[in-house]
Every structure is written in structure tokens, then in C-alpha cells.
Amino acid sequence: MRSPFPVPMVPLTIKTWQKKLPNWLTIYRIFIAVPTIIFLGLNHLLGSVASFTVLGNVTIHLQVSLFIGGVLFITAVISDYLDGYWARKWRVVSNFGKLWDPLADKVIINGVLIALVAYGYFHFSFLIVIVLRDLVLDGLRFYAQEKQLIIPANQWGKWKTTWQMIAILMSCFVFSFSLKETNSANTKIFYWAIVHLPYYLATAFSLVSFGIYAQQIYKTIKVKVKL
């Protein structure tokens, strides 16, 4: 994902570790998916809960494994921004990064989404739409490359990834903490809204970005055929 921070354009003396660091962050994002999914599974299987009291009379229950999984995912999100930012800042964008950076995003995001669905944290219909969209879109990208078509990425796809990350973090941290009084209707509505709204937004951005990309490919092919 493209970093929102400005990249200075000044002469640089690049050290070896600076050339390698963005790629190592990409590799880290792939491998951190495994312990993240494991901790989500441990929470589902063991249900380790720590309870503590705040403000004198409010009891909070913390699902430890789910919380740790959320923290690990945050490190993946941070690495996603930093590898792109540093690669452009130091002008060390590599073919490895171009290939593996988007794949690393798919591994960590789709892997965690599958785990959350398997453990019942949100409905599988969201996952089906998102995964099918990615598969078809990857096929279209491969077709475009084979035909030497230049199809620029659109901002909707970046928003899709952003909302997917927000949705995962909401699932991990909202479900990690629960008050003792969680049976009230208002509390249930709040939990449902804050967890599910990001998934709806991520799904909407997925469909819109897919439609835009497919339309761009169709128009490009049409123009090329006329030529």
C-alpha cells in the first residue's frame, strides 16, 4: 500500500541495509501471518480470559490470545506502510518489492480473514466476495500483462485494503474487550455496528474497484483493437 507521507527528492548515499530493509519488511509481513492466525485459533480453542476492574466497579474481560493476534496484525500494518515509504524515500524500489509487496498484503489479510470466518467472528459472505474479487482481478491483471496493456491502479482498491485492515483490527480488539454488562440491547447493537460496518465498507470498495479495473481493461482492449 502506498504510504501517505511525502517522499523527499534529494541526492542520497544508500547503504546496504537500506536497500534490503523494505524487502525484509515485506518478508516479515508474510511470516507474521502464521503466528497471528495461531493466536486467533488459540483464543477460539482455549478462550484464555483475563479479568480486571477499573473505575472501582467496572469489570473488563480481556481475551488474551485474540488481543495478541491483533497486536501482531498491527505490526504487519505498520510494516506495510514503512516498506513502501522507505523504498521510495531511499529510491530502492526493487522488482522483488513490486512482486511480493501486494502478495504479502494478500497473505496476511486474506489469511487472517479466513481465520476470523472459521472462528465465527464475522459472516463468510464478506470473505467470499473479497476473495473471489481478488482471484478474478489477479486473472485480469495477468491477462493485461500478457497483452502488454497498461492499466493503472485506482484509489478504490487502496481504500479497500485500508478498510479490510480496519475491519480486522476492529474484530480483534472489540472482541478482545468486553464489559461485564454485555447483554443489554444497546451494547449488542454497538458491538455489531462497530465490527460489521468496516466489513461492509471493505466489500463495497472491493466491488467498486473491481468494476473500475474491469472497465479500464475493456476500454483499453477496445482502443487497441481499433488501432
UniProtKB/Swiss-Prot annotation:
GO terms for biological process: phosphatidylglycerol biosynthetic process. The keyword Manganese does not apply. Its main location: membrane. The keyword rRNA processing does not apply. It is found in: Cell membrane. Pfam families: CDP-OH_P_transf (PF01066). It is a multi-pass membrane protein. Keywords: Cell membrane, Lipid biosynthesis, Lipid metabolism, Membrane, Phospholipid biosynthesis, Phospholipid metabolism, Transferase, Transmembrane, Transmembrane helix. GO terms for cellular component: plasma membrane. Its EC number is 2.7.8.5. Pathway: Phospholipid metabolism; phosphatidylglycerol biosynthesis; phosphatidylglycerol from CDP-diacylglycerol: step 1/2. It catalyses: a CDP-1,2-diacyl-sn-glycerol + sn-glycerol 3-phosphate = a 1,2-diacyl-sn-glycero-3-phospho-(1'-sn-glycero-3'-phosphate) + CMP + H(+). Belongs to the CDP-alcohol phosphatidyltransferase class-I family. This protein catalyzes the committed step to the synthesis of the acidic phospholipids. This is CDP-diacylglycerol--glycerol-3-phosphate 3-phosphatidyltransferase.
